[in-house]
Every structure is written in C-alpha cells, then in structure tokens.
A protein has these predicted regions:
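The feature marks proteins involved in alpha-glucan
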Residues: 11-72
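Short beta-strand segments enriched for Tyr within beta-sheet-rich domains
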Residues: 17-25, 82, 94, 161, ...
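C-terminal catalytic histidine-bearing segment of alpha/beta-hydrolase fold enzymes
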Residues: 230-234, 239-292
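Cap/lid segment of the alpha/beta-hydrolase catalytic domain
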Residues: 109-164, 168
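Short beta-strand element of the alpha/beta-hydrolase
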Residues: 81-84, 91-102
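Conserved acidic catalytic loop of the alpha/beta-hydrolase fold
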Residues: 82, 160-179
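Single conserved hydrophobic/aromatic residue that forms the stacking wall/gate
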Residues: 2-9, 13
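Primarily recognizes the serine-hydrolase "nucleophile elbow" in alpha/beta-hydrolase
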Residues: 110, 171, 178-228
Length: 292
C-alpha cells in the first residue's frame, strides 16, 4: 500500500491490482512464529484481470505424480513432478513444458488442469524437477539455476535439465521432441534459468516462458535473436527490481527484433500473477484463440 501511495497512483493501482496475503502470529521481534504461513487470501481490484478457474488437488481431471530420478549429471536423486492431462497416452506426442521449482508446482497445475478441461488451452504435459534447497545454509537453487555463480554446479544442472530430463520424458511419457512443441518455464531465479537455458539451447526450445526475472540481459545471459525461442515475459509493477529487469529484457528483445510478448500487471513478486499468466502463455504458444 505504501509503495502504491509513493507512486501517486493509488486509486488506479488499487482497481487493477491483484495480490495474495495472509495472517500469521508474530513473535516479539515481529517475525512469523514457525515461519511464514500460507498466503491463502486474495485482493483483486474491480478492474483487475478476471480470476481464472482452478481445480482442487483432489479434483484434477488429469494427474500429478512424483517420481524419483537418479541423475548422473547431478550425482544424486532428484524428485520430479509430472502432470499428465486427461486422456493422455504414451503415443500422444503432446507439447511439453519443462519447468523449474517442481516442489512448488501444484498451484500452477490447478489452473492448467482447469484450462485444459474448459478447452481454453490445448492438452500439455508438465515436467517439473524439484529445486535444490534454499534455506539458512545458502541458496543452492540459485547456484543451479543462474550462470555466473558456480560454473560447475550450473553446468551439471544444465546436463540434467536439458539432456537427461528430456530423454527420460520422451521415453516415459511420449512427449514431443519437436522444438516448436517444447517450452521452458520459470519464475524469479527460475526465469533467469529459462532465459539462459533457452538462449544456450535454442535448438531445443521453441518457447521460453520467463516471469519476474531478476537478472537483466547482459554478459551472464547473452541473447542472439537469430533462431531464438519466442519469449513470454510477465512482471508486476510492484516488484521494482524484478519489474525493471524483466522490462529490460522486453526492451532488449524489441531492439534486437527477437519475438516476444510482455505482460505488465499491477502486482508484487507474487505467485498469483504467475499462475494466472502461465495458461495465457500456453494459449499464445499453442492455442488457436489466445486467452485475454
């Protein structure tokens, strides 16, 4: 609220804003006891984008399962969430989204499953390996996702994500191996991963879906428009650093005539904008009638 007031756009922003919030018991230092709880409440302004339908976890038309994958590249087991749409069969050869942060994928799947059931988007498969830990001991997730911090760790994760994951997914679930029906997806540091991987392996991915990127274009993520994937960008005006970086990507792609789409929302660094924009990106990529 204070950020909205400081920009002098209070009424306009409030009418267009969407954000999640929650209530948690605080200790004497003002910190949530036991950590931050669920962000299970929603504010949606009267002029904000319409809320998309969502299915409950136990009411999915498709299926969401967890698999244990032994990765030679990572030298460890890594859990992978796999969403299969209703009616899937191994010979379906469906479009596939390779996503980061599989340990947090459920809210996205609820929206995608509903959108598929309502025929708002075509059936897709989602392959989402869990992220490395991000806790008081350090941010291992960022070391795997982003170039320029730990080259060996980043390279090992690239071999896992790009090579091992796609081979396993094609063999186990019959997902498409065609570039135009492969997408890579991530938010925040996951968006940086999507942009870096999409650039480095442009022959594999026809679409790069990157929301609220924290790393602007530059030396760490070089981008050449020649043969680049279509980039779907989204950021909220109330997440200043991430909005600035994502807007820089939009400007960079526009300047270099690299195909892209940038959606700007009145929102913070908030899950709600990401789960609502992903079905729209899928419709834009593979649907006949893009969602508004």
């Amino acid at each position: 609220r204070d950020l909205v007031r400081s920009r002098g756009l209070g009424d306009v922003y409030k009418r267009q804003a969407v954000f999640g919030y929650g209530f948690w018991e605080l200790d004497q230092n003002g910190m949530p006891i036991g950590g931050r709880g669920p962000v299970d409440r929603r504010y949606r302004g009267k002029n904000a984008p319409t809320e998309l339908p969502s299915h409950d976890d136990d009411g999915l038309a498709g299926s969401l399962t967890t698999h244990e994958f032994n990765s030679s590249a990572l030298r460890e087991n890594r859990r992978i969430k796999v969403y299969l749409p209703p009616g899937h069969s191994p010979d379906s050869n469906l479009p596939v989204i390779y996503s980061t942060d599989g340990n947090m994928i459920e809210p996205y799947i609820r929206r995608l499953d509903a959108a598929i059931a309502n025929q708002a988007i075509p059936p897709v498969v989602v392959i989402a390996p869990h992220a490395a830990p991000m806790d008081h001991t350090g941010n291992e997730r960022a070391l795997e996702y982003l170039p320029g911090f730990d080259d060996q760790r980043f390279d090992r994760h690239q071999r896992f994500f790009v090579d091992e994951l796609s081979q396993w997914s094609e063999e186990e679930f019959g997902v498409s191996d065609a570039r135009e029906f492969r997408a890579i997806f991530g938010c925040s540091d996951g968006a940086g991963h999507a942009l870096a991987t999409g650039s480095m392996h442009r022959g594999r991915y026809g679409h790069c879906i990157a929301f609220s990127a924290g790393m602007p274009p530059g030396e760490q993520i070089a981008w050449n428009a020649d043969g680049a994937p279509f980039v779907h960008l989204c950021a909220g005006t109330l997440e200043p650093g991430f909005h600035q970086a994502t807007e820089a990507w939009a400007a960079w792609l526009h300047f270099h005539s690299s195909p892209h789409h940038f959606t700007e929302r009145v929102c913070g660094h908030d899950l709600i904008q990401w789960i609502e924009e992903l079905p729209k990106s899928i419709a834009r990529a593979w649907g006949q009638d893009p969602m508004t």
